[in-house]
């Protein structure tokens, strides 16, 4: 997992509440066994017209000023629905490093931390202000500083955010579940050898 300390990136807005994991990554694309390659299917039913190839010009992420965006700004209850980890894999593979919303579905929120995508919960008022600023920016950029737990835009917007200390540590050091286990490899090996 890639570590996350300070990230500056273009903001893409998704002005929709209750976006569920089936909208993030439709079920027909879940047959892959790799964790990569899902970005091409992110928001597939919204990003593409019925032919599945032509980009929908009305979809927010298809705007030219947000191409290459790495911060997603959206509304409440993002990531609801089924517990598929593929949703976070798709966001990560597409290039998103952080998602900002007033609230997240619990399982999706946990999956983000396990896969190196930083979910940031801000108040609805702060999210609304960011939407208004993003509409004026061309493109609009934010700096997300996980070390100091602050978001800034260099134009007067600055807000702090909270992240659990252990999750913050893991994100700062790029530690997923496997990497955390490997930190104790010597103890695991000693235990296994002692068991004979």
Curated annotation (Swiss-Prot):
- Tell me which NCBIfam families the record gives: leuD (TIGR00171), PRK01641.1 (NF002458)
* MF (Gene Ontology): 3-isopropylmalate dehydratase activity
Record's catalysed reaction(s): (2R,3S)-3-isopropylmalate = (2S)-2-isopropylmalate
The job of this chain, per UniProt, is described as:
Catalyzes the isomerization between 2-isopropylmalate and 3-isopropylmalate, via the formation of 2-isopropylmaleate.
Question: What sections of the sequence does the record tag as coiled-coil?
Answer: none
Q: Which CDD domains does the entry mention?
A: IPMI_Swivel (cd01577)
A GO biological process held by the record: L-leucine biosynthetic process
Cite the annotated pathway: Amino-acid biosynthesis; L-leucine biosynthesis; L-leucine from 3-methyl-2-oxobutanoate: step 2/4
Q: What is the lineage of its organism?
A: Bacteria, Pseudomonadati, Planctomycetota, Planctomycetia, Pirellulales
Q: Which Pfam families match?
A: Aconitase_C
What name is this protein filed under? Answer: 3-isopropylmalate dehydratase small subunit
Which keywords fit this entry according to its UniProt record? Amino-acid biosynthesis, Branched-chain amino acid biosynthesis, Leucine biosynthesis, Lyase
A single GO cellular-component term from the record reads: 3-isopropylmalate dehydratase complex
Q: How does it assemble?
A: Heterodimer of LeuC and LeuD.
The family classification in the record reads:
Belongs to the LeuD family. LeuD type 1 subfamily.
Q: Does the keyword Lyase apply?
A: yes
Q: What is its EC number?
A: 4.2.1.33
Say which domain of life the source belongs to: Bacteria
